[in-house]
A protein has these predicted regions:
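Segments of small-molecule ligand-sensing domains
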Residues: 299-311, 321-375
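Extracytoplasmic ligand/sensor domains, especially the bilobed periplasmic-binding protein
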Residues: 53, 97-201, 250-275
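Extracellular/periplasmic periplasmic-binding protein-like sensory domains
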Residues: 238-313, 370-372, 376, 381-386
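Beta-alpha junction/loop-to-helix N-cap segments that form part of ligand/metal-binding clefts
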Residues: 26, 30-32, 46-53, 60-136, ...
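Extracytoplasmic "Venus flytrap"
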Residues: 25-56, 78-84, 107-108, 172-180, ...
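Extracytoplasmic/secreted proteins, especially bacterial periplasmic and envelope-associated proteins
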Residues: 45, 50-57, 61, 86-93, ...
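Boundary at the C-terminal end of the N-terminal hydrophobic targeting segment
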Residues: 20-24
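Bacterial N-terminal signal peptides
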Residues: 5-17
Length: 386
């Protein structure tokens, strides 16, 4: 006679117990990640390559091999056109409607900075943003992708002022978070050598006429002129410099701009431009990881030519997969963070061995290149900034 009351009590306990909520974006069958990116506007090519031909390329390989602990990875992307306000709206939609597990490889300092606080409040991981502002450093739910501007600046100034002994520097920069973060870093690092920027000129995003800025910089007669721009204005600047016959300055491209396709927009006006490259040559490198990337690109996207942007996205997909595999079958946002923090000496076959420290940065190096006939000629081995 005591069995029935006991069963009723047990049933009440079970039904009354709080249920453990499923982790957003994670089911028995899949993991959903997404991002707001530029699929239109000045960085459309970059956005498409780092996501649809980069991250998604690596996830195709993973999914065809059985997924991550049996789960396939699915991606959701929205276009922000490099507009911060659209990036905010897209990111909220991804989190609140699509219930993504994490945001992966969003692009551009202004859009990324605009969404940063929201994602931190929601405790949603922002993984490997393709931007350079140091504002992402050391945040629990952010793992930075690209070499940050202050690290890039340190490598650039140490090489140009320290090794090559240039003394007079100027900068043409984009008037936003991207440009200003580099400008501040250049001033700080030049100060270590008792130097400063002797001239600076700013441009707005999307500008097509930079003739006035180039004329003013030319008049300052710098030995080195930094280009802290997106591709369109950079091409206009290089063509204008060629047009006025300005040959006695070394044009130096920042890492986010240093790609053959984008510098080729300036055609032969890009010859002789130097800069900090963040990725090995995707077409010719014999590094094992780059060879695999090329083989997978040929298999899955045979019409898409290998490039540094899709290689960066492929690398981001690799790091996400490594973190999620380490986190185990019981994947949560916090377990992913802990797993990524455990990466030490990870061999990717693409970049030097990776250790992720408290700063959550995944890239702290670059190497110096010069544009010759629309290709990069390496001038140094890896330069590092610790």
């Amino acid at each position: 006679m005591i069995v029935r009351p006991f069963l009723l009590l047990l049933l009440a306990v079970v039904l009354g117990a709080p249920r453990v909520a499923a982790e957003p974006g994670v089911t028995d069958a899949e993991i959903v990640v997404g991002g707001s990116n530029s699929f239109s506007g000045p960085l459309a090519y970059t956005g498409e390559q780092i996501t649809k031909f980069g991250v998604d390329l690596y996830f195709k390989v993973v999914n065809d091999a059985g997924g991550i602990h049996g789960r396939k990875v699915r991606t959701v992307y929205y276009d922000d056109g490099y507009r911060p306000q659209d990036a905010v709206a897209n990111t909220k939609k991804l989190v609140e409607q699509d219930n993504v597990f994490a945001i992966i490889i969003p692009q551009g300092s202004p859009p990324v900075v605009a969404t940063l606080e929201y994602l931190e409040q929601q405790k949603v991981p922002m993984l490997f943003p393709y931007q350079s502002s140091p504002v992402t450093r050391g945040r629990r739910y952010v793992f930075q992708g690209m070499t940050l501007s202050d690290r890039s600046s340190r490598m650039m100034i140490d090489y140009l002022a320290g090794t090559r002994k240039f003394k007079k520097f100027a900068a043409l920069y984009q008037d936003d978070e991207y440009g200003k973060s580099f400008l501040a870093a250049f001033e700080k690092d030049l100060g270590r050598y008792g130097l400063r920027l002797t001239a600076t000129e700013s441009v707005k995003r999307g500008v097509t006429d930079v003739s006035a800025q180039i004329a003013k910089l030319h008049a300052a007669r710098p030995e080195v002129t930094f280009l802290v721009l997106v591709p369109g204005p950079a091409a206009h600047a290089l063509r204008e410099r060629q047009k006025i016959g300005w040959t006695d300055t070394l044009m130096v491209s920042t890492g986010p701009l240093t790609d053959e396709k984008y510098l080729a927009l300036a055609t032969d006006a890009a010859n002789g431009v130097e800069g900090l490259s963040l990725w090995p040559d995707p077409m010719t490198s014999d590094l094992k990881g780059v060879q695999l990337y090329r083989a997978y690109m040929l298999k899955y996207f045979p019409k898409n030519e290998p490039n540094r942007y899709s290689l960066a996205g492929y690398f981001a997909g690799m790091l996400f997969t490594e973190g999620a595999m380490r986190a185990g079958r019981n994947l949560t946002r916090d377990s992913l963070v802990t797993a990524l923090e455990s990466i030490k000496g990870f061999e990717t076959g693409i970049l030097p061995p990776l250790t992720i420290g408290p700063d959550h940065e995944t890239q702290k190096q670059g190497f110096w290149v010069r544009v010759e006939n629309r290709r990069f000629t390496p001038l140094t081995d890896w330069l590092k900034s610790e």
